[in-house]
Amino acid sequence: MTNIHNDKILILDFGAQYTQLIARRIRELGVYCEIWAWDHNPAEIAGFGAKGIILSGGPESTTLPGAPAAPQEVFDSGLPIFGICYGMQTLAAQLGGATEAADQREFGHAEVNVINPDALFKGLSDHGGEPKLNVWMSHGDHVSVAPPGFTITATTDRIPVAAMANEEKRWYGVQFHPEVTHTLQGQALLRRFVVDVCGCQTLWTAANIIDDQIARVREQVGDDEVILGLSGGVDSSVVAALLHKAIGEKLTCVFVDTGLLRWQEGDQVMAMFAEHMGVKVVRVNAADRYFAALEGVSDPEAKRKIIGNLFVEIFDEESNKLKNAKWLAQGTIYPDVIESAGSKTGKAHVIKSHHNVGGLPEHMKLGLVEPLRELFKDEVRRLGVELGLPRTMVYRHPFPGPGLGVRILGEVKREYAELLAKADAIFIDELRKADLYDKTSQAFAVFLPVKSVGVVGDARAYEWVIALRAVETIDFMTAHWAHLPYEFLGTVSNRIINELRGVSRVVYDISGKPPATIEWE
């Protein structure tokens, strides 16, 4: 079988907000890559076996003492190097060029003039054949003097060195960000570096990844049994489908129905996995335990803790019944791995971790199976489709681990959860009907623990309030509220109030992030 990790790129992270985006773009080209902190062990960098190295952007300044720098082993490797933004600045500073602080930061669209087309730029244009490109800038410093052996390949009206190249050594640098979509020829530039200059084969495809992981899982677990906590979310669902294909009936999934899931989600999970795919799923109906444990609790963090601890407790009980299980499968994905690796100096970018299963009891002496640990979320979704999971499941909006427990403000009660699940289902149903679901990044309903006066028939009613929330975002770090049509919102409001007894008012949240968070709790 072809080794899909043979041709790979190493990205050294200098703390840029876009570093993961660089990796995702390279993976989209069909080439495997990894992100390591810039201060990673130099011997491991030298021994990684990359076909090329990318130096990412970053928030530091090369004009200050102690600025992060690429290890000498990078330059000694003889490999092609591509410096992006700060990555180009440290290339210049380390190789005998000069950088300086700009009078003011440059952030946004810019026009680059290609004056000496190199292997990356040759023939590219956004202006009808003229050697000009529309790019995205985000920098304070810039290269003022290119290092010896380098040619200035592009400039702008504001900076003398927008790109540079040493074609003999195959070292390149650009001041702009090819990884963002605002740089129209960005993916073409990355392809030229990764495929043309570095010579990488495009082996990183969904079908190849599935074959590779099936072989790895079979080698890892042998004839042992594996247990998986199935939540109905994308990651655990893809793990379930992948492991079922790899080891069949040796996989047992435990699905804990907390009573805090989306409308009829428990039945949908069982229909999909147990009935349609033949996966062995143990369904634990634990709603009574959850509502009893949450009684009288209104603090959001306390609710999260109770919900998380109870899941671990129930999962532990069920795993003890499976005497032959030697392995625990988890839906850990690549951003979790980057977070745990960290940086020795603390100057590299740290991403908040969202582990699927955390805090499992120490006495659970199970080995870990993590078939998604090399993948980004978009890759996990593509794998899910390739494995035959419905697109509607694979491309569902994010759902919080504690479920409706953090979308019911204040104390959680069974009747609140049922009302909210139905209201949420109506909202999502109408979004799909209006072809707006995929145009929003996340949409959901929130139960507000306040009553509002309304008129139902000829009588006054004093009933609950439902808030609707819909946002558009690229990375979930910042978000804009979705400008849904008024007529659409009116339709959703009418359905919720007419179909749900106990709701008299529906409001729409028009807060951005920041200052508000996407979830209410």
Curated annotation (Swiss-Prot):
Catalytic activity, as annotated: XMP + L-glutamine + ATP + H2O = GMP + L-glutamate + AMP + diphosphate + 2 H(+)
Alphabetically ordered keywords of this record: ATP-binding, Glutamine amidotransferase, GMP biosynthesis, Ligase, Nucleotide-binding, Purine biosynthesis
Biological or metabolic pathway of the protein: Purine metabolism; GMP biosynthesis; GMP from XMP (L-Gln route): step 1/1
Keyword Ligase: yes
GO cellular component annotations of the record: cytosol
Active site: C85, H177, E179
Binding site for ATP: S231, G232, G233, V234, D235, S236, S237
Molecular-function GO term, any one: ATP binding
Residue ranges constituting the Glutamine amidotransferase type-1 domain according to the UniProt record: 8-203
SUPFAM superfamilies: Adenine nucleotide alpha hydrolases-like (SSF52402), Class I glutamine amidotransferase-like (SSF52317), GMP synthetase C-terminal dimerisation domain (SSF54810)
Domain GMPS ATP-PPase: 204-396
Cited CDD domains: GATase1_GMP_Synthase (cd01742), GMP_synthase_C (cd01997)
Superkingdom field: Bacteria
Family annotation (InterPro entries): Class_I_gatase-like, GATASE, GMP_synth_C, GMP_synth_GATase, GMP_synthase, GMPS_ATP_PPase_dom, NAD/GMP_synthase, Rossmann-like_a/b/a_fold
Annotated EC: 6.3.5.2
PANTHER family: GMP SYNTHASE [GLUTAMINE-HYDROLYZING], GMP SYNTHASE-RELATED
Function according to Swiss-Prot or TrEMBL: Catalyzes the synthesis of GMP from XMP.
Subunit structure: Homodimer.
HAMAP family: GMP_synthase
Protein name: GMP synthase [glutamine-hydrolyzing]
Native source organism of the sequence: Stenotrophomonas maltophilia (strain K279a)
Name of the gene this protein is made from: guaA
